[in-house]
């Protein structure tokens, strides 16, 4: 049995996450009272006719505060039944959440006559703290549209060929902000920038002319070797510590050239020595 617990602040994309999981064969329950989590797991184990039942539940601020505060012990109870259980926590910055509520005109579950929307969003963080602290995977949706979020969930949760730590090597551009869910961040903005070559500007690190230009730069090769040596040594230690997900982010200015090139090379090299290595380019349209 596999159980995925989806949580996060209102407006972060939980409904989209459940939709993706349902489309991929999961039996989904929205707004499950957290106190029922062990009972749900027990019943799914006993009564299901499926060899590998897939269940996803959403647990969020609509729960009783007393249930949310007990989440650590409830999760421990579920995992004691030898159930594969992943906790997915979605979030976005407060400005983005405020904008999303303004656009949809939906009421925040914690807002009332004495509490503004901004205060409700802040209070929600405290309520969901016990879940966020135990999340196996955190996805920040600030810069993701609906389709990018769906693709990210499928990539990180559903496309693992084998059990074990899932590694994501991700390129990004600093001008759009660092990925807040990254475990390791490497800044490669000091390297020669193909952007300043007019014939390369419109291309990306996936294109052969850009790759050839960067491969010819000694500093780029030195940077690649240093990052690869570090990852080759230390990523197995992350896996040995029972980490479910590890994100390695490579950043340049715009996220189109240098970071993309290095991310591709590192991903391909790591796939030869580690299981479950995926590659993603955040800022390529």
Curated annotation (Swiss-Prot):
InterPro entries attached to this UniProt entry: P-loop_NTPase, RapZ-like, RapZ-like_N, RapZ_C
SUPFAM superfamilies for the chain: P-loop containing nucleoside triphosphate hydrolases
Top-level taxon: Bacteria
Pfam families per record: PapZ_C, RapZ-like_N
Classification via Gene3D superfamilies: P-loop containing nucleotide triphosphate hydrolases
GO molecular function ontology, one term from the record: GTP binding
Residues annotated for GTP binding in this entry: 60-63
UniProt-annotated binding residues for ATP: 8-15
Presence of the UniProt keyword Lipoprotein in the record: no
Keywords of this entry: ATP-binding, GTP-binding, Nucleotide-binding
Entry function: Displays ATPase and GTPase activities.
UniProt similarity note: Belongs to the RapZ-like family.
The protein, known as: Nucleotide-binding protein Pfl01_0854
């Amino acid at each position: 049995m596999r159980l995925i617990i989806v949580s996060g602040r209102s407006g972060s994309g939980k409904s989209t996450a459940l939709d993706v999981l349902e489309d991929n064969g999961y039996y989904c329950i929205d707004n499950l009272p957290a106190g029922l989590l062990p009972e749900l797991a027990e019943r799914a184990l006993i009564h299901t006719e499926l060899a590998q039942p897939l269940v996803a539940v959403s647990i969020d601020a609509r729960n009783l505060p007393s249930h949310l505060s007990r989440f650590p012990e409830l999760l421990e109870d579920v995992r004691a039944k030898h159930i594969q259980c992943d906790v997915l926590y979605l979030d976005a910055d407060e400005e983005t959440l405020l904008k999303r509520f303004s656009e949809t005109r939906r009421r925040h579950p914690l807002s009332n006559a004495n509490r503004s929307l901004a205060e409700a969003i802040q209070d929600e963080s405290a309520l969901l703290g016990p879940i966020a602290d135990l999340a196996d995977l955190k996805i920040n949706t600030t810069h993701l549209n609906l389709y990018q979020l769906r693709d990210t969930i499928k990539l990180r949760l559903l496309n693992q060929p084998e059990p074990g730590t899932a590694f994501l090597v991700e390129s990004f551009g600093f001008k759009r902000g660092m990925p807040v869910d990254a475990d390791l961040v490497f800044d490669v903005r000091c390297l020669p920038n193909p952007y300043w070559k007019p014939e390369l500007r419109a291309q990306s690190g996936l294109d052969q002319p850009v790759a050839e230009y960067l491969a010819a730069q000694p500093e780029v090769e030195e940077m690649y070797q240093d990052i690869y040596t570090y990852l080759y040594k230390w990523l197995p230690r992350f896996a040995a510590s029972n980490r479910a997900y590890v994100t390695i982010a490579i950043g340049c200015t715009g996220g189109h050239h240098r970071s993309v090139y290095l991310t591709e090379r590192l991903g391909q090299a790591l796939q030869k020595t580690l299981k479950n290595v995926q590659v993603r380019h955040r800022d390529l349209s």
